[in-house]
């Protein structure tokens, strides 16, 4: 059916999970690859294992998109505070609409990144998570260096696929890097995130995502996202559309 084909194009291994869970009326025995596919554990022992990049390199990412060009891509990164600042921002950039969300992490560790993924999945459900985040491109920072923990969701179902830029090649995720410039207008380098709350960060992202972009034909990322992303995702993000004449993209926005 067309629905089955759509899921397959997004992510083959996610399709097998849907079949296994009974969401689709196909049996695993009809799919030989499923028998051979081993569900990976979410063990933290992989954190420093360079074999984690096998099948997840930037070249693999390009090959996947060449075969499935309509796949939604999310670029992921972190924004650091000043020296001595413990908290960091996890940023998720939806390439389809240029919307970026940021989450405050207690520290730059994979367990905190996983906690954000888990929270989103619990709210949206595994199927919706996989639909919205079928493919995530990030760098090789230590906070992302446990793909199994990020890819595995509830009941060990694969919820996404993680791919990595080449070493020292952050330019391979240009949309994320470009949007960080908006964050730096409000939180310049040297800013500590330790005194901010998630409410502060969400307010900042509401202003950033309400800002019209020439690259979007004068639309804002938030307006475009409302057309491109499921409504439950927009609701979950908790962003507020700010009128053009009230948008603040300076440090004054978060001054206590």
PLM regions and their residue ranges:
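Two-metal-ion RNase H-like nuclease active-site motif
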Residues: 71-81
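Short, small-residue-biased leader/transition segments that mark boundaries at the very start
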Residues: 2-8
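Active-site beta-loop-alpha junctions of metal-dependent nucleic acid enzymes
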Residues: 81-85, 102-127
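Basic, flexible linker segments flanking DNA-binding modules
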Residues: 9-66
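Short conserved beta-strand segments at catalytic cores or DNA/RNA-binding microdomains
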Residues: 66, 79-101, 117
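RNase H-like two-metal-ion nuclease catalytic core shared by retroviral integrases
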Residues: 138-140, 145-153, 162-186, 194-206
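C-terminal domain-tail junction helix/linker
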Residues: 189-256
């Amino acid at each position: 059916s067309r629905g089955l084909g759509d899921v397959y194009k997004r992510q083959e291994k996610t399709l097998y999970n849907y079949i296994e869970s009974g969401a689709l009326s196909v049996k695993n025995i009809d799919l030989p690859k499923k028998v051979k596919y081993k569900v990976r554990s979410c063990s933290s022992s992989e954190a420093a294992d360079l074999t984690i990049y096998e099948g997840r390199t930037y070249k693999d990412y390009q090959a996947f998109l060449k075969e499935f060009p309509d796949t939604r891509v999310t670029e992921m990164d972190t924004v650091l505070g000043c020296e001595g600042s413990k908290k960091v921002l996890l940023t998720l950039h939806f390439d389809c609409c240029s919307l970026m969300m940021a989450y405050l992490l207690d520290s730059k560790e994979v367990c905190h990144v996983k906690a954000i993924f888990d929270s989103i999945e619990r709210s949206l459900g595994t199927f919706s998570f996989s639909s919205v985040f079928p493919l995530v491109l990030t760098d090789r920072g230590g906070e992302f260096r446990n793909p199994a923990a990020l890819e595995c969701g509830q009941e060990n179902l694969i919820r996404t696929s993680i791919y990595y830029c080449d070493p020292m090649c952050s330019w391979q995720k240009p949309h994320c890097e470009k949007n960080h410039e908006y964050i730096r207008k409000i939180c310049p380098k040297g800013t500590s995130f330790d005194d901010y709350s998630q409410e502060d960060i969400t307010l900042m992202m509401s202003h950033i995502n309400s800002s019209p972009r020439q690259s979007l034909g004068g639309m804002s990322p938030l307006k475009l996202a409302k057309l491109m992303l499921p409504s439950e995702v927009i609701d979950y993000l908790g962003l507020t559309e700010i009128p053009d004449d009230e948008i603040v993209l300076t440090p004054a926005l978060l001054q206590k």
